[in-house]
């Protein structure tokens, strides 16, 4: 099986975003704008939570894939590169989660 990275997914979304909306779900979602894309991301997040709580492993995998895809679409529309998100994660993981949270609450 070929391994797909989040960077690969980011590139796929960017490519498909440039297609005609009648030919691509991604292009249609991008053309609809950030409110529509963000709403869809929220729906997928809720579906992922429900799958996790219900203990449905297969559905959790499926919904997680949908969630990651829709996050990439939202980031694409906002012109936020995945690398910016990964850099923030790297910064946060350089310290304990509790310390990182305390730093955010008491800047």
UniProtKB/Swiss-Prot annotation:
Q: Which cysteines are joined by disulfide bonds?
A: none
Top-level division of the source organism's lineage: Bacteria
The keyword Ligase is assigned to this record: no
Extract the GO molecular function terms from the UniProt entry: ATP binding; phosphoribosyl-ATP diphosphatase activity
Q: Which GO terms describe its cellular component?
A: cytoplasm
> Which Pfam families does the annotation name?
PRA-PH (PF01503)
Pathway membership, UniProt: Amino-acid biosynthesis; L-histidine biosynthesis; L-histidine from 5-phospho-alpha-D-ribose 1-diphosphate: step 2/9
Stored SUPFAM superfamilies: all-alpha NTP pyrophosphatases (SSF101386)
What this protein catalyses is:
1-(5-phospho-beta-D-ribosyl)-ATP + H2O = 1-(5-phospho-beta-D-ribosyl)-5'-AMP + diphosphate + H(+)
Q: Name one GO biological process term.
A: L-histidine biosynthetic process
User: What's the EC number here?
Assistant: 3.6.1.31
Q: Which UniProt keywords apply?
A: Amino-acid biosynthesis, ATP-binding, Cytoplasm, Histidine biosynthesis, Hydrolase, Nucleotide-binding
Under the heading InterPro entries, the entry gives:
HisE (IPR008179), PRib-ATP_PPHydrolase-like (IPR021130)
Where is this protein localized, as stated in its record?
Cytoplasm
UniProt cross-references to NCBIfam families, sorted A to Z:
histidine_hisI (TIGR03188), PRK00400.1-3 (NF001611), PRK00400.1-5 (NF001613)
The record's similarity note reads: Belongs to the PRA-PH family.
Protein name as it appears in the record: Phosphoribosyl-ATP pyrophosphatase
Name its species.
Answer: Sinorhizobium fredii (strain NBRC 101917 / NGR234)
Q: Coding gene?
A: hisE
């Amino acid at each position: 099986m070929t391994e797909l990275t989040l960077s690969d997914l980011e590139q796929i979304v960017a490519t498909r975003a440039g297609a005609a909306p009648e030919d691509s779900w991604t292009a249609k979602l991008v053309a609809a704008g950030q409110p529509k894309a963000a709403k869809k991301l929220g729906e997928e997040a809720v579906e992922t939570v429900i799958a996790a709580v219900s203990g449905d492993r297969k559905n959790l995998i499926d919904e997680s894939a949908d969630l990651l895809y829709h996050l990439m679409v939202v980031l694409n529309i906002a012109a936020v590169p995945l690398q910016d998100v990964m850099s923030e994660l790297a910064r946060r993981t350089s310290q304990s989660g509790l310390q990182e949270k305390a730093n955010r609450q008491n800047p």
